[in-house]
Amino acid sequence: MTEHHNSDPRLDTTREIRAPHGTTLRAKSWLTEAPLRMLMNNLDPDVAEHPHALVVYGGIGRAARDWKCYDKIVEVLERLEDDQTLLVQSGKPVGVFPTHKNAPRVLIANSNLVPHWANWEHFNELDKEGLMMYGQMTAGSWIYIGSQGIVQGTYETFVAIAKKHFQGEANGKWVLTGGLGGMGGAQPLAATMAGFSMIAVECDESRIDYRLRTGYVDRKATSIDEAMAMIKESDTPISVGLLGNAADVFPELVERNITPDVVTDQTSAHDPLNGYLPQGWTMEKAAQERTIDEAKVVKAAKQSMAIQVQAMLDLQYRGAATVDYGNNIRQMALEEGVENAFDFPGFVPAYIRPLFCEGVGPFRWAALSGDPEDIYKTDQKVKELIPDNPHLHNWLDMARERIQFQGLPARICWVGLKDRERLGQAFNEMVKNGELKAPVVIGRDHLDSGSVASPNRETEGMMDGSDAVSDWPLLNALLNTAGGATWVSLHHGGGVGMGFSQHSGMVICCDGSEDASQRISRVLHNDPATGVMRHADAGYDIAKQCAKEQKLDLPMLNEELRRL
């Protein structure tokens, strides 16, 4: 055990965590080694935003409640038997119970509050008392893979924007955005992959430098003029990290009559206390004020967000394709008096929902061996099994060429109900026959078709008005537990902040066994199928057609499906 050198039990600057590589186990089987390695991988300094504070990404999205809890989780996973299940309550290991070999080895509930109390004020009180932890989406569920985790979804969105607004031609066009954190850091690479140039405004210079080192951003600028010159002088799409505050830069562009082609934002606006720097403040002032007067910080941050959103609306009025990228900044601005904050759409209803209707979403896998060759072999297997999707092949080629692995090698690849189970079975077979050096884990973001209720993001503007119904992610978590996922998580507040979302995650370990094959056939079919079910239930024709093709049994719709 390491002695803590700070009164905050969540902070220990002496710790450096990296997942083990190779085939030597610290746990009793791969089913418990897998969550152990992925927990540790979440805190790898090449992966996490602030690993010494257990913060993985997204403001204060943590992997464990404090270092004592982290150490105890590791200790339990090392001794856990294959007929036991560990329960984790907001980053704290609270119980080990007898189950069976096909049950999940870990069940996780993070940040869940009774709805009346589901707000940042109450959460922050509990967090200060050490009674809760913000799990974000993949931070507290141990399946974060670095910025790659959102690159493809962002790339798909930018491709869709190009098709909708620019006849599919992004070259010569540029995107304005804010935020280069764990999620926002994916934007510059995704933009240039899709053919756009980008100026990404970031107030923390260390984040720009990190994205430069890892190849996610091409250049750094300290003024609007410098950034604009870089874009104009480049013959090919280029991304620029602009040091500044989005609440200053966005309105300055309006004043100077500079209109980007596309405008969005991925600052951590979902968390006004910890995630957004108020206009005119330094990082140091914000850190100090948080310890003195939290309400003052929140108010100043939300007022600054209102200024930024007003500028986004002004740029939209001038012709920029403007879209909310799911950080709840419109809601924050609305609460500060910007009455038309929702005049620009969220990215899911605007561009992603047709994919969700077919259960297509951010399928991801990581090589527990730590060997990049295992990922390259699985890339090839995906191409073999899905031969007639040139867009997907292009993504895999670009990902191999341009995305640096962070921590354990991993890949993200948007596929749906028709393909997830097939890919999982193929990967399991590759482990069984020794093509891969060690097992792989398959998971996904909580941003998926059947696993989230978030009225300002994934379920915004559902055609039947069921945006806020959160039975669906609960059913998804229950079904993945029943199906035998290796670990299952149920969270609140990810992406958009407290009170605005509920969502679930699952990870399954492909260890090459017959038992794993049977679990894969259940979990990797059922998980995306809940998304098709949810969208079919809401009335989407694409989802109904997919349900019919995939022979889903949806009692209230079966008669209608037979007539299709």
Swiss-Prot record:
Record-listed E.C. numbers: 4.2.1.49
Cofactor binding, per record: Binds 1 NAD(+) per subunit.
The entry's keywords: Cytoplasm, Histidine metabolism, Lyase, NAD
Organism: Vibrio atlanticus (strain LGP32) (Vibrio splendidus (strain Mel32))
InterPro entries on file: Urocanase (IPR055351), Urocanase-like (IPR023637), Urocanase_C (IPR035401), Urocanase_central_sf (IPR038364), Urocanase_CS (IPR023636), Urocanase_N (IPR035400), Urocanase_Rossmann-like (IPR035085), Urocanase_sf (IPR036190)
Protein name per the record: Urocanate hydratase
A Pfam family reported for this protein in Swiss-Prot or TrEMBL: Urocanase_N
HAMAP family: HutU
Gene: hutU
